[in-house]
């Protein structure tokens, strides 16, 4: 005969099965990842900030002037080393030497707009900058508002909360006005053109609102484009239905960007890391 207690055990097992609960949890996380930061509660933002902290920034490579000995690519004959080696065998080129160009990580420069219009997104973007600074070499981070502030050193702490507090304390124009052209000019003159920007992958994170002259911003973007390897503009407003880059700052800057992408959600920032690493 059938044991009625067996049905009870099976029903209990089905109720206790983690499958449906995990599925619901996974669905909620995926929904949260696609949610606009400006629509998130404080609890949701905390969870998203943790996810942002786990994003990986692989280093794209650039060719170095240095060469490395190799046995794998016989097409790259190192003539000078082969001749020197031949002197050890009475001038006979018995041992040929090969080399290839060495590679180095390409510098990543992050410029973050912390003006009032970027308030709903700024903290998530600072979290992103922290993940980049602690996750790979050759990363520089600056904030832009009414002034330029370098925050690379403040973001080097492995503790994300401590790093963000330190960065926030050093940024005096947080949630203030916007002078993108003027602050970009300061970056170009003091840090960028002869240093950090040259050959770098530069990421501008801004909604493009600027109270200054669009001609100034246009000039500074043109200068940046000439020296950077690649210039990416991340705009949190780009995902908005019907959006067009009509703000005078964004319209002035757009012709000098290599890629123009969204930056309003975790999913969009994850896509940015993929572009950076490619």
Task: Describe the predicted segments one by one.
Residues 163-185, 260-275:
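Extended, charge-rich low-complexity interaction segments
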Residues 102-170, 180-186, 201-204, 237:
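Von Willebrand factor
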Residues 174-208, 213-218:
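C-terminal structural cap/anchor segments
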Residues 221-278:
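Von Willebrand factor type A / integrin I
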Residues 146-149, 209-210, 238-240, 267-268:
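Conserved nucleotide-binding/hydrolysis micro-motifs of P-loop NTPases
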Residues 121, 141, 152-153, 193-199, ...:
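Extended hydrophobic-aromatic, low-complexity segments
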Residues 1-105:
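Acidic/polar low-complexity segments with low predicted structural confidence
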Residues 83, 111-115, 199-212, 258:
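DG-centered beta-turn motif at the end of beta-strands
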